Amino acid sequence: MKDLTNEEKEQLLKTVGDGVLALSHDDIPYCIPFGFVYIEGIVYLSMFPKGRKWEIVQKNTRVCFTIFSWNEDHTEWSSVVVDGKILPVNDLKEIESVVKANMEKMGLDPTTYLEKRMTMYKKTMDNPSALKIFKIESSQIGGKKMKMLIGS
């Protein structure tokens, strides 16, 4: 097993579509898959403020987010683990950059999607049950890669 370079970690974070958010409260772990975007060292997620994940985040903001990827013939994998704190994003300019990045990742048309999505966020900023964007401010980003030993 080898450490990923910073460039390899960045590349994975920019290209992998989904990851797993790990939460914990009272020594009970909880992991849930999430789509995400990565912008300048920060992982962004969106979630509705309800359910088990929301209850846990209210009590413990320390999280871990993991992504992984196999090469084409499944003989080598790479993973990145982001440790940090999950925090709400309330700045509309930051939200707009997240929406744009998500739009690009999903291949959506910016001329219609961005305006509609930003209108929704502006209208629901003060609604406690509306979809919210969160960011993981990382304390550490680690990465590993491993080649499978075939035939040994």
Give a label for each model feature.
Residues 9, 53, 94-98:
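Amphipathic alpha-helical interface surfaces
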Residues 13, 56-57, 102:
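A generic structural signal for nonpolar/aromatic side chains embedded in well-ordered alpha-helices
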Residues 48-51, 63-69, 114-121:
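Short acidic (Asp/Glu) patches
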Residues 23-25, 69, 137-140:
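Short, structured patches in soluble enzyme cores that scaffold and shape functional sites
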